[in-house]
């Protein structure tokens, strides 16, 4: 693990400790008066790949969510200037990935979607990825417009609202999608156990015989 990754994990540990081990319901504990919003219930029959909005990735690519189909995805919604929950959410997604047996890892994509249409441009997201050593092919950071972001959040069950200071209150949620973009597992809260998410990913990969492709 390189120094950037170690630095990122240190930030996550500090943020997670300050923020608390599990604020999956409601919280008013950080210095920005951030409120954690509980996630909505969702249907596991709906695919996010039916959404036709356009996104820009941190590498400058324009894509739709359907371009991700064919492999399981670990997805979370964050914003780049968040210094409390969001770094922990990113690290939680990485914890899921790193807990997979190595032969499964190349069949999984990690996708971070920003709430912050104004500040999290593709360039800003690329800088975020570079800063924390998240620039390899497994990671995709996405920027979209307000309607596109809202539609995705609704299907994922992520609640968020923009505050007067430009920051966001939001749900802390890491979601596992199957190859067709349907929800198969969710982790709500911060620094939560990842075993169920890992098992869900392995099942998707095995059921679709992806190891043999």
Where is each model-derived feature located?
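N-terminal "domain-start" segment that seeds a small globular fold
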Residues: 32-66, 91
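Structural microenvironment flanking redox-active thiols in thiol-disulfide oxidoreductases
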Residues: 90-152
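Short loop/turn microsegments at loop-to-beta-strand junctions
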Residues: 50-51, 73, 171-173
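Short active-site neighborhood of thiol/selenol oxidoreductases, capturing the structured segment around
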Residues: 65-93
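Histidine-centered metal-binding segments
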Residues: 21-37, 213
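Bacterial N-terminal signal peptides that target proteins for export
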Residues: 1-7
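Thiol-/selenol-based redox modules, centered on thioredoxin-like
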Residues: 163-213
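N-terminal signal peptide c-region/cleavage motif recognized by signal peptidases
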Residues: 15-17
